[in-house]
Structure formats: structure tokens, C-alpha cells
Amino acid sequence: MTLRPGERDLAESLAANALAFLAAEPERLERFLSLAGIDPGGIRAAAASPGFLVAVMEHLMSDEPLLLAFAANEGIKPERVVKAAHALGIVPWERGFA
């Protein structure tokens, strides 16, 4: 996939917003951390991993109500989240998100 200049940066920014969205509600964050196998005390170390933002976006993409809530919170169409996920290298139909 060919990215336009700045597209990956925008996708990473949206993924960081998604993490903040998850962190805003303890239940959301706990579910993400549990499914990702991350201890709450290890979130800072995990966040330094190159794949962390990808994991955040994969989590959103795997839960349609959560994806829709995030998109509404951001004031964007859900398709924008999908495009950001693609820019981060996530191919939804290969991971069962279709």
C-alpha cells in the first residue's frame, strides 16, 4: 500500500487519540489491557513498542460498538478509523474485521 505524505503520522495520531479514549473509562482500558495481555503497570513500557498503536487500532476494529463510539467522540466517520488502520498496516479482512 502506498501512503500519501503524512498519512502514517495522522494514523498514529488517531491511534493515540484512541488510546486516550480507552483510558477515559477504566472498563474500556481494563478490557483492552486484558485482551492485549498487558499488565496495567506495564502500559508505559508497552506503549514504547512499535506495535502498540497497531494493537490499539486492532482492538477498536474488533468491537463495532466501541469503534462507532470512538468515531462519534472524534467527530469523524468510522471509515476514517478504518483508513487509519490501513495506514498502520492493518488489513481488516485478513484479521476477521470485515
What is each of the regions a protein language model found here?
Residues 1-98:
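Metal- and O2-centered redox machinery and metal/ROS homeostasis
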